[in-house]
């Protein structure tokens, strides 16, 4: 009936708003995706070149090239591997380190 259809439309619009929100984008960052990006980037920081091969205990993080806070999405082409030092200094700036 029309009431159910209207409720469904409201439900879908809320889901779309969430998926575009910062929280929605961060929720898309799964451990599987993090691992995939690190493997793609050969476990190497795209900024300074530090790698776990040279520094076995190096903390690597996945960074949004265009920050979520500036409209960036959690997609493979907007993600890169950075060491913790480079990621902290980058913050939410848009810096192309590739």
Where do the protein language model's features map onto the residues?
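Long, mid-chain structured domain cores
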Residues: 1-3
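Short, charged surface segments at domain edges that flank catalytic/cofactor-binding sites
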Residues: 5-49
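Histidine-centered nuclease catalytic patch
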Residues: 50-82, 92-97
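A recognition module on extended beta-rich or small alphabeta surfaces enriched in W/G with H and D/E
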Residues: 87-88
């Amino acid at each position: 009936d029309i009431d159910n259809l209207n409720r469904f439309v409201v439900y879908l619009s809320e889901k779309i708003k969430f998926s575009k929100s910062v929280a929605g984008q961060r929720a898309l960052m799964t451990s599987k995706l993090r691992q995939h990006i690190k493997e793609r980037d050969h476990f190497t920081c795209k900024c300074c070149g530090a790698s776990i091969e040279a520094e076995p205990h190096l903390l690597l993080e996945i960074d949004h090239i265009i920050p979520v806070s500036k409209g960036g999405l959690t997609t493979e082409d907007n993600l890169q591997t950075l060491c913790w030092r480079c990621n902290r200094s980058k913050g939410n700036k848009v810096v192309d380190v590739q």
